[in-house]
Amino acid sequence: MMKKLIYQTALIAYVNAICFRNFRPTCTKISEQYNRNIIYDSENSYVSHDRLQRLLVFEGKWNTYIQKHYSCLLKLRESSSKKKTYLIIDDTVIAKPYSKELDSLSWIFSPSDRQYLYGINVVFVIWTDGNTRFPIGFRIWNKHDKKTKIDLAMELLNEAKKTYKTKPSYVLMDSFYPAAKLLKLIRKFRWQWIAKIKSNRCINGTQAQEFFRYRYGNHIGKLSENIKARIVKDNDNYWATSDLSLKPSDVKQYYRNRQIIEEFHKILKSELRLEGCSSRESLAQMNHIYFVLMAFCQLELFRITRNIGTIYKVRAVLFDCVVPKNLNWKLNIMAFA
């Protein structure tokens, strides 16, 4: 019980320091920020550098922790909102240009950065209704592992279905992910999907760039392995969807929601320092990702319950606050007006 309490205090310190400050999250700096304004005879105990280091290499069930404490975001919005909801698949690179000893490091092309980066490739699936965002989970891709990023995305979709019982209007993905086996899994779940596809993807046995002879196009055909889809062309862009009832304009409109996961990645990196863990332990790197996701959920829950526009607006006020000693933040709402 005492050990659990010690790790709980360290976790609160780690998550709150990430939320309330903008620095590289080393154990020393987190300890310094959290321990400020603590009185010796108060109920709050000091969190040492060593305790935070032990937390980073502790094999906790962090995914279960996120589900228990933050899935209310998903459930409340999904049950009350009449908006369309989406599951979005994407991956990002956690740049580690100076690391050498981590097993999962490799050179990966980052489309958002338009260059090859040396780092950790992470596959995310998030749920959103266009406003609220909730991370279903993540998987780290290892080039030495037999699992592909498609396989990892399928694991996360299984988690969304079985653990969170989600019923998305559409699953959104870029042109890397609509492999036949992933699309079949979505069909098995009785979900619909919308994806960007490459110009060399075959439609009825002919590449899309040759199938459509004009600038714009719209056709119901079959992709590989007899997967029926509506394919839409707009200049050099191609989309496909399993929902044959959609108009071409609707396909493009709904697909724009995929941009939400790009902003999600931006917040994790620029605001919550996803790339900031300097540990050489693979477990510590993975735990840091979990703690950053907890910080994101904490900010998102605060933003939604207080009806604040963006996480950036929340953070601008938090910078001037003392790092709290619990996760039940009691802040002056007028500061966010």
State where each predicted segment sits.
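Gly/serine-rich nucleotide phosphate-binding loop at the start of the catalytic core
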Residues: M1-I66
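Residue-level signal for inorganic ion chemistry
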Residues: I30, V125, M294
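Single, function-defining residue in the core of a domain
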Residues: M2-Y7, L11-N16, R21-T26, H69, ...
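Alpha-helix termini
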Residues: I38-D41, K75-S79, K161-T163
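Active-site-proximal, Lys/Arg-enriched surface segment
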Residues: A17, R54-T132
